[in-house]
Amino acid sequence: MNKDFYISIFGDRYDREAVLFPASVTILLIVFALGNILHGYLEHIDVLDSKVHMTIFAILILIITKIMMWIIRTLSKNSIERLTYGKEKLNFPTISILLPSSSILSNEYKNRILLKAQKDFEIDLNTSISNQEDETKVRKVIAEVTNLIRKKVSRIERTETYLIKNIRYGRCRNMIGGSTIAILIQLVITIYSAIKGYSLFCPIISITISCMLDLYMFYIYKQAGIEYAKELFENYLICKNNE
């Protein structure tokens, strides 16, 4: 398969590991919940009857997967992150760990990052951060700086560790979004199954798995964000001024 075609369908490494994987898990959990209902319908349909049917079936799966990827990415970025880090995402780790009050990074390390940002982006961070008593305003200043840092880092050849941490954070966030979608759809399936007299075994097991997955991802989500933020700044510090 042509590499460009492959990327156009499945995306780059980040898309495949941080978005496609959660979307696939979400679809599988929903399909499992639909087990008894689908079995009743598929008994009357020979999906794999011909190459045409197989092609249509494959295209349908691809379309559903692409739609689910878009839904999960959109929901996770616009809802999960805002619920976790605030409406303006001012509590995001890339902001929080640079605050003077944060002990996650040493003061010396934070100063190195801020001094470099001051030179690179010609911003007077001394006045904006050190002499500012309103923490919300400080967070907004740091948010602007980290946004510039992220853009600068995106233009250089990032380390493998950075890519792994970025993917891990994105995958955690998108798994939370995906499992939340799965739970909502599974609840509808459970109610429908109860009304129609189908077995509730598959929907209940599926909901249980989705809830456990959701809780686990919430548990590691914030730590994944902190690890990503640390790696972002580490990559930034090795950037040359002209990059």
Predicted regions and their residues:
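Transmembrane alpha-helical segments and their cytosolic interface motifs
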Residues: 11-27, 149-202
